[in-house]
Amino acid sequence: MSLWYIIVVFVFFASIFIAKNTRKTKKNLPPGPPRLPIIGNLHQLGSKPHRSMFKLSEKYGPLVYLKLGKVPSVVASTPETVKDVLKTFDKDCCSRAFLTYPARISYNLKDLAFAPYSKYWKAVRKMTVVELYTAKRVKSFRNIREEEVASFVEFIKHSASLEEIVNLNQTLVKLSGSVICRVGFGINLEGSKLENTYEEVIHGTMEVLGSFAASDYFPVIGGIIDRITGLHNKCEKVFKGTDSFFDHCIKHHLEDGGSKDDIVDLLLKVERGEIGLGEFQFTRNHTKGILLDILLAGVDTSGHTITWVMTHLIKNPRVMKKAQAEVREVIKNKDNITEEDIEGLEYLKMVVKETLRINPLVPLLTPREASKDVKIGGYNIPKKTWIHVNIWAIHRNPNVWKDPEAFIPERFMDNQIDYKGLNFELLPFGSGRRICPGIGMGMALIHLTLINLLYRFDWKLPEGMEVEDVDLEESYGLVCPKKVPLELIPVLTQWT
């Protein structure tokens, strides 16, 4: 009797297994690892999903099928598959998966980064491209960038005179914040009443958006889990703080006469109908949603990218020496460094590209959602499937890059590969309809800051530290900054 029982149980589970695999074969889904009941493949993502997904792609191929809780997902990890997602089928793959807390933080998806693809999204995207991110607009904020970088240099100079250690993670993010607040709100952040509030807003928002939200993967019980873990309450607290911060910024702008040529001024014109948005009414919450995108994208990406560049330079003395020699030869003895000076610095541009390759700030793009059934790489991708684009995997792929773990700026010497979304081997800012629109603004600050740091100062490690002690591990969240802060001592030179 017991033998028959064992046989019946075996046949039952074997039938389920065969049925599931038959259904998967008929659906022609991409290959993927076995999954557990309820949680699916969530346990395989770990604390750094971009690295875990890269390993899975090495085993299962350029397209990997995962079930993340209740969510069917696909990971694209090669230039060919990513090109299909971001270019060939961009229109069908560029909507957004609904994410609970990004939706709340962004005023119910009234921003651009997290909003689904729709007529509204297209209208606002067009407005921002035409009004906010043109070359003329980027150039109009040049004086602000140059003034803030000059102030930053004075701070570094003071630290150098005292032989003090400088925490570059902290100071560079603060520099980015100062620029963004002047460009966005017309506010000098340092010494203002909003300085502390601003830091709380940035840190709190990044923490919430970078947290694992159970409600995104488990429709009913997930919300309960988020309340138990405290994420729900944390999000509400952060949202109220962010909303209050934007209210104060807009109030400050209006009380100041509202005549400054900043981004708030532009968005208020859209609110008043002075700049058309077609059939859509642009409210104060829409203004705040767009400001949130600008604040988050501008502050962390520029500051942390410069930190990664300096990290690789201090780890590679040969590259540091070559970059400084170029900068000092081109700049010579100029008192005032301007953004025009970047034009002749070809090696520095290669250093920045190589940093963006090894340490893209967003290694795993915000998940997209297929708006209809599509076929990619010979596999069926059903409607509503989440699509994860693993930039990290492309940038570390030995079939794409020779010695991908090595920092070699010279690899860009004999090719025209750029980071503007047209070369699918290098996509630090994404591509297609969802490409980061503020590339020009961010790169202008990155290059200007680096020219000053390399021209005016030499750099050394704190006493007792060796080059081998400099850590290259990244943290994971909405962006991936250097986990251990980079602390260096600036040294005065004849160019200081």
Curated annotation (Swiss-Prot):
Looking at the keywords, is Membrane present? Answer: yes
Q: Name one Pfam family in it.
A: p450
* Molecular function via GO: heme binding; iron ion binding; monooxygenase activity; oxidoreductase activity, acting on paired donors, with incorporation or reduction of molecular oxygen
Gene Ontology cellular-component terms for this entry are: membrane; plastid
Q: Which enzyme class?
A: oxidoreductase
EC number(s) given by UniProt: 1.14.-.-
Annotated positions binding heme: 436
Show the SUPFAM superfamilies listed in the entry.
Cytochrome P450
- Family recorded in the similarity comment: Belongs to the cytochrome P450 family.
Name of this chain's protein: Cytochrome P450 71B13
Q: Please name the source species.
A: Arabidopsis thaliana (Mouse-ear cress)
Q: What is the lineage of its organism?
A: Eukaryota, Viridiplantae, Streptophyta, Embryophyta, Tracheophyta
Q: Which gene encodes it?
A: CYP71B13
